[in-house]
């Protein structure tokens, strides 16, 4: 199975956790994301090096105007899409299996959590994961320590308080 097929499954909204092949591939990419975030978080890097490492995490290039202050954490990495002139401040955590879309000009404050997964409410099905995308629209500012849950789509030009 390839990443493309896994992303199609994740983006379809189908339950995750019932297909062993999907789970194993997701874990493989999670380990890759852990290695790359560890590289970002454990020593000083110039801004262009951070952008390069972040691009490797998400599997696509970010613009020259991208900014990230470490530490940064993601437990998958391959379902993040970043617009132009985006800034992510220190201590952010992205759980992106359900898809995280951050449009142009967005500012993400210190310690923000973007969580796209939920476990099933039925204890017998608790290992199943339900995902939904988060879409941060153009020029949105998310204040420090805010938690944005699965399925949230912001309006344009708003700020979300901490």
State each model region's role:
Residues 1-65:
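Terminal amphipathic alpha-helical/low-complexity segments used for targeting or macromolecular assembly
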Residues 2, 69, 89, 122-123:
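Hydrophobic alpha-helical segments, principally membrane-spanning helices and signal/leader peptides
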Residues 56-57, 80-82:
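Short, T/G/N/S-enriched strand-turn elements that build extracellular solenoid repeat scaffolds
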Residues 64, 69-70, 75-76, 83-84, ...:
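Left-handed beta-helix
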Residues 119:
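Histidine-centered active-site/metal-ligand motif
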Residues 124-129:
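Regulatory activation segment
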């Amino acid at each position: 199975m390839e990443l493309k097929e896994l992303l199609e499954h994740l983006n379809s909204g189908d339950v995750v956790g019932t297909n062993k092949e999907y789970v194993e591939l997701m874990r493989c990419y999670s380990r890759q994301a852990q290695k790359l975030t560890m590289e970002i978080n454990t020593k000083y890097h110039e801004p262009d090096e951070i952008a390069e490492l972040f691009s490797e995490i998400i599997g696509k290039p970010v613009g020259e105007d991208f900014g990230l202050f470490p530490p940064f954490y993601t437990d998958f990495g391959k379902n993040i899409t970043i617009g132009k002139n985006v800034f992510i401040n220190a201590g952010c955590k992205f759980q992106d299996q359900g898809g995280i879309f951050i449009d142009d000009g967005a500012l993400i404050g210190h310690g923000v959590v973007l969580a796209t997964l939920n476990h099933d409410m039925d204890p017998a099905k608790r290992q199943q994961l339900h995902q939904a995308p988060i879409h941060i629209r153009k020029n949105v500012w998310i204040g420090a320590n805010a938690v944005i849950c699965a399925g949230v789509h912001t309006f344009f030009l708003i700020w979300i308080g901490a």
